[in-house]
C-alpha cells in the first residue's frame, strides 16, 4: 500500500485505533479522495478523531481506500463519531459529493488496540 497524498505520516499517538476499508463505487475513488482531503479529515479533527494514515493499494486494480483513526478510548470514539455524523458541515459535504450517486459501495471497520510490545 502507498500513503495517499493527503495522509499524515503515520504515528501512533493513541492506544485505540480503528482500521476502516472503503470499496469505492466504480470510477468514484478520485471523488472519495477529494472528499477526504478537502472535508472529512478536518471534520474528524474537529470532533476529536485522530487521522493516523490513509493508504491506497499498490498491487492490482483496486477501488479501495484503507485508513486508520485514533482515539483515547471507546467513549471518545463514540462521542467523536456522533458529533461528526450530526455536523451540518459533514452533511453538506457528503450531499454535495454524492450528487451523482454514492461514493462508497462497501465499508468495513475493525477496532484495534496496540499490544504492550508494539513500537509507538
How would you describe each model-predicted region?
Residues 18-22:
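Short glycine-/aliphatic-rich beta-strand segments at the starts of folded cytosolic domains
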Residues 60-63:
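Short acidic/glycine-enriched loop/turn segments that link adjacent beta-strands
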Residues 113-120:
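Acidic/histidine-enriched, glycine/proline-rich intrinsically disordered or flexible terminal extensions
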Residues 24-33:
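Short, surface-exposed ligand-recognition loops at beta-strand->loop->(often short) alpha-helix junctions
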Residues 23, 68-70:
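Short hydrophobic/aromatic beta-strand micro-patches
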Residues 55-56:
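Trp/Gly-enriched beta-strand/coil motifs that build multi-repeat beta-propeller-like domains
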Residues 3-12, 34-52, 71-111:
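An amphipathic, aromatic/His-enriched active-site/gating alpha helix that lines ligand/cofactor pockets
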